[in-house]
Structure formats: C-alpha cells, structure tokens
Amino acid sequence: MYIFSLFLLVILAIIGYGIAVDRKEYTVLDKAKDTAARQRFYRKWVATSWLFYGLPSIVGLLILSKMGVDISLPEVGVNLVPAAVSVSVIVLLLTVVTLVQAKRASANDRKKVQQEINQVSGGSIIARNSSERRLAAVLSLSAGINEELFFRAFLPVVIIGLIGSDLAILAIVISVVIFGAVHLYQGLRGIMLTGIIGVVMMVVYLATGSIFWPIILHIIMDIRSTVVISYLAYGNK
C-alpha cells in the first residue's frame, strides 16, 4: 500500500535529519563547560525525542491499526524467552551493582571513573551534577519510550509492509542496523554498542510480544548509563 511508502519516506527523513543534527549538537555538548549549556542540551533532546520519534510512531501506528494492518511482529520460530529473561536479569544486576558501588565509592574511585568518562565515546552525555541528573533521567525516560516505539514497533512494521511478512527477519535486521547507525555521533564504538542494545531490545520485544518490556529495559539501561554512573563518578555534587 502507498501508506507504507509514505511512512518510509518520513522515517528516512527523520533519520537523516537526526544523524546530521545529533552529530553537530553532540560536538557542542562535548565542548560545553558550564552546566547551564548542558542542561539546555538535555531539554532540547527530550523535546526532539518526542517530536521526531515518539509522535510520528504513535500517529503512524494508530493510522495503520485503523486501516486494519497488523502492527505486531510475526513469529520468528525461535523461543527467545530464555534469552530475554537472561539479558533482563543481567541489566538489572549491573544497575544494582553500579548503584552499590556509587554509594561506597571513595574520592579516588570517583576520580578514576571521571577519567574513564572523559575518554569513552559518548561520555559527554553522562550527567555531571544533581541538576543534570534530573534532566538525564527525563531524557532516559523519553528515549526509552520513543526510541522503542520508533525502532522496534513502527519501523519494522513499515518495512514488512513494503517487502512482505516472508522477509520479516530482514526487516528486523534492517531496523536494528538503522538503530545503531543513528548513533553515529558516538563514533564506531558507540554504533556497535547501540547496535548490540538494539538486538537485545528486539529479542525482548519478540519474546514478550509487548513493546512495554523493551521500553522498561531501555529506560533502566539509560538511567544506569547517564544517572547512576554519574552518581558513581561525581557523588552528590
């Protein structure tokens, strides 16, 4: 149907714009020295997350549903429940362990983590103080909801609508690759890491049949990365 072609054009435009703009904005964030500038960045990314990923996904999925299109992903013929449970437990354990480390960290421990943050690709997005942590938590919540709706629920359905359900696996792979590619601003390591995260989220979605669970897992992972690790590095600052 023509609607899938139209949606794909919209999706490609959003992705192209996002790659170009995110890279520029992340460069600005990387150079930002004052917390006011960093907080403006968080607020802007929260807004753009809803505008470019959340809203189009919700509207698109509602339209397709009203048209009678099955917006769930087809069965892949493999029991993914054990894998989904395993990765979920690992993520939860890592988050708890990091939180415990943050509470027990010494001044030297925090300095070491700060040095690692400054060296790692994507480290600039980690909050530096309590004010930034609050905004980073909101950004994590927004990213978890909107990116999962866009890359796990909306994008694969549109691709399947164009190439057919027989090639559903290909559509799923393409959506995971695109999810990694939009994180170009984080460098090659960031692309590979987010690509792996995309695989994990897709496994959870396929195993549960509900977008709710990958959203929750995504939020937890992002909060660990931007908020809990920030607490580990900077304490109650």
State where each predicted segment sits.
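Alpha-helical transmembrane segments in multi-pass membrane proteins
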Residues: 1-90
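Hydrophobic membrane-targeting alpha-helices
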Residues: 18-23, 62-63, 67, 96, ...
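Transmembrane helix-loop-helix hairpins at the membrane interface
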Residues: 11-15, 122-237
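Short helix-terminus and kink motifs of transmembrane alpha helices
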Residues: 23-26, 103, 107, 153, ...
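Glutamate identity and glutamate-enriched acidic tracts
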Residues: 25, 39, 75, 116, ...
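Residue-identity detector for threonine
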Residues: 27, 35, 48, 95-98, ...
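Juxtamembrane helix-loop-helix connectors linking adjacent transmembrane helices
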Residues: 62-142, 160-164, 235-237
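Short helix-coil transition/hinge motifs at the ends and kinks of transmembrane helices
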Residues: 30-35, 111-112, 162-169
